[in-house]
């Protein structure tokens, strides 16, 4: 652990053998007590909500941005300003004493699922004097310390003012993108003004750790640290970034080649990469010019992080005004866009929903990390060879060939057709894409999703109280179409997009009716297109008398809801 702390730039490091879900809970239990206020990235992992429930904390949410393509963006800098935080606290019904309160901890997911990396120095500086501790949940970002691309963009990176800055935690799923065994995780600590008493921290650590740990996991964490020490870590990450950049450039080149050479207009389509089309470069004389990304040397793209920084109000990212150097797009996290929607969120007349492509890839052994309605994420990791990225390109070409030739679905998805012969037995790939795209277009899915996250639900009770109601049987399963004015007892997370639409203790209200609309849409979609269902956390699926899927979720029983009158009941 001491060696790992040195390698990862921490004061102290702790090895954890039950994943970063447990690491997050350890951090919470080390510094948060019942009634403490915590600032929470709404784009958080479910383990953060579990931690809030376990500690009895009061969550105040930081809202991430979102573009018209449905991609989850960063929390804008002003969300971290004291004036904005104070406004949210004053409007929260869960904070009874608006004058005397403590904000113990702020939690930020870094990087986002689509590879947006924060300038952590800017966040730490803004939270100076506001919170005691900052936790960067970097489950998918443990490699950042080992390449200049990410300097200043991970929790342990910036040098902080030890007398004024908050103490910083980062949690890493070392098993995800480094070389540890499954469930291997690390907690890194960099002390600020309110230093961690490591004797007390150890009590929280032992609360969640087994007295009979799997020592192979611990050994693998040690090996992972050793692998990244010295120049080897830089070499491994450099190689990964190189492969990702080459893939990005190939995809762009292929798109242009198909557009130029394909005679049949209907076949002039390819997948787009979510990235800037051009980058502003500066020569030795200080002269600036715009270059197409596919024309820039890979070495330059690796050596200049500023080329990957999002500029304010640029059309390609769609997140509005961003401060210079605040957000960097991680080259190794590649978001692929399928045809069907413009950058402004306008649905085209034809398209190929991403779930069709990702199901095709999955059946051929290619793992897609995350899928939206018209996008999916490909993750380049250590050891990814040219052969593997070449296989991905080959399978995308195979899909295009099958689509252009309008192949029968039986040739594309034989298992799905076998399971649902009445639905798909005589259908072709183009017909499936047309039906699904038209359904999404008529549902105005891009607009609905944007509205879902534009208005935060009303907080009615503490998440810990909502969970107690669940345990005590004071809840009931409610059909999603009947959710109006009900208080949720669970966190509901639809995939796509992967952000909770409602948290435990929040109420479904007329102001947030789009949430219910989206859940109803998802239920209907799953019944219309079996085999391509959405993934839903927090919902229970039942079959009705017609063998149709019906969504239910746990809400506080109405008889108990009527008793909710005072702060003491929260």
Identify the meaning behind each predicted range.
Residues 1-2, 6, 231-558, 562, ...:
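Non-catalytic terminal extensions of PLP-dependent enzymes
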Residues 7, 18, 23-33, 39-255:
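Conserved PLP-enzyme active-site core in the AAT-like
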Residues 14, 60-62, 369:
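General small-molecule cofactor/ligand-binding pocket signal
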Residues 14-16, 106-109, 376-381:
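Short glycine-rich or small-residue beta-strand-to-loop segments that form or flank ligand, phosphate
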Residues 124, 128-129, 563-565, 569-570:
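Hydrophobic topology marker
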């Amino acid at each position: 652990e001491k060696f790992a702390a040195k390698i990862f730039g921490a004061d102290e490091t702790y090895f954890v053998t039950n994943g970063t879900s447990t690491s997050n809970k350890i951090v919470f239990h080390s510094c948060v007590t019942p009634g403490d206020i915590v600032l929470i990235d709404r784009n958080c992992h479910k383990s953060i909500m579990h931690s809030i429930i376990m500690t009895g904390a009061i969550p105040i949410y930081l809202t991430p941005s979102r573009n018209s393509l449905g991609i989850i963006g960063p929390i804008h800098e002003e969300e971290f300003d004291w004036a904005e935080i104070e406004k949210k606290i004053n409007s929260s019904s869960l904070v009874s004493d608006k004058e005397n309160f403590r904000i113990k901890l702020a939690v930020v997911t870094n990087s986002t699922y689509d590879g947006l990396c924060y300038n952590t120095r800017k966040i730490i500086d803004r939270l100076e004097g506001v919170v005691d501790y900052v936790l960067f949940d970097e489950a998918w970002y443990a490699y950042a310390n080992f390449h200049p691309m990410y300097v200043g963009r991970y929790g342990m990176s910036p040098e902080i003012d030890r007398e004024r800055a908050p103490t910083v935690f980062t949690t890493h799923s070392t098993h995800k993108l480094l070389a540890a065994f499954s469930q291997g995780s690390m907690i890194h600590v960099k002390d600020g003004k309110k230093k961690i008493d490591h004797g007390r921290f150890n009590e929280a650590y032992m609360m969640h750790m087994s007295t009979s740990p799997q020592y192979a996991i611990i050994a693998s964490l040690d090996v992972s640290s050793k692998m990244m020490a010295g120049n080897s870590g830089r070499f491994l990450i450099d190689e990964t970034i190189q492969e990702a950049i080459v893939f990005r450039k190939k995809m762009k080149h292929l798109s242009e080649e198909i557009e130029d050479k394909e005679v049949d207009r209907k076949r002039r389509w390819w997948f787009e990469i979510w990235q800037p089309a051009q980058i502003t470069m500066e020569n030795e004389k200080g002269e600036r010019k715009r270059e197409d990304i596919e024309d820039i040397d890979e070495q330059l793209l690796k050596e200049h992080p500023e080329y990957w920084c999002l500029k304010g109000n640029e059309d390609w990212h769609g997140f509005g005004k961003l401060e210079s150097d605040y957000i960097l797009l991680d080259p190794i996290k590649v978001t692929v866009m399928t045809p069907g929607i413009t950058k402004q969120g306008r649905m085209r007349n034809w398209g190929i929903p991403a779930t069709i492509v990702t199901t095709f890839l999955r059946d051929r052994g290619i793992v897609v990390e995350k899928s939206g309605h018209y996008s999916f994420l490909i993750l380049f990791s250590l050891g990814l060879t040219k052969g593997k990225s070449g296989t991905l390109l080959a399978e995308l070409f195979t899909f295009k060939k099958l689509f252009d030739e309008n192949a029968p679905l039986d040739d594309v998805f034989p298992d799905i057709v076998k399971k649902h012969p009445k639905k798909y037995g005589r259908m072709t790939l183009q017909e499936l894409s047309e039906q699904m795209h038209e359904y999404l277009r008529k549902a105005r899915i891009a607009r609905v999703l944007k509205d879902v996250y534009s208005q935060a639900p009303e907080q009615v009770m503490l998440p810990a109280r909502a969970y107690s109601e669940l345990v005590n049987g004071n809840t009931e399963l409610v059909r999603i179409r009947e959710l109006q004015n009900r208080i949720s007892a669970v966190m509901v997370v639809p995939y796509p997009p992967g952000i909770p639409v409602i948290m435990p203790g929040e109420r479904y209200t007329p102001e947030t009716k789009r949430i219910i609309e989206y859940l109803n849409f998802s239920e209907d979609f799953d019944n219309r297109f079996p085999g391509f269902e959405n993934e839903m956390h927090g919902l229970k699926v039942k079959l009705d008398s017609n063998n149709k899927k019906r969504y239910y979720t746990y809400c506080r029983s109405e008889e108990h809801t009527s008793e909710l009158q005072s702060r003491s009941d929260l």
